């Protein structure tokens, strides 16, 4: 039996779906892990843009967005849990104190309150952010089990992949952090 000190904390890591990922919801995804503890894990899929853009989402929640470069930024599918709820992964904003914000080890924050979107709409919010609808969640031990069955690769997250890399390149870019490419991955799990 492992001691609590033996636990691996995957907070601020990418989960990269292996080719043998059985769940089609996560096939080909990169998930940024916002929280990982003995109670479970919470992450956001960062490479599945939806057909909803910021302008249409802001209209739905009665916020006016007039900042031209932001209007057509896509909203992402963050995962199959709470798909009606928004999750904003962002760099910290000096002096900002959003109502429902969680600091993530490694420097990013995740905010679920509308005030961060109000700040974005007025130009006072985070400059680099990713907005998702929904999140990915795992119960106690569930993620560890999926990793042990070769469902996921893990690697320390790089914010440049989250914020600066085009969505369609994030999977390969995350694999590149491990020094591999998708052509090197096998769908077959091997055990000695």
From Swiss-Prot:
Pfam families: DUF179. SUPFAM superfamilies: VC0467-like. GO terms for cellular component: cytosol. Gene3D superfamilies: VC0467-like (3.40.1740.10). Belongs to the UPF0301 (AlgH) family. This is UPF0301 protein Bcep1808_0798. The lineage of its organism: Bacteria, Pseudomonadati, Pseudomonadota, Betaproteobacteria, Burkholderiales.
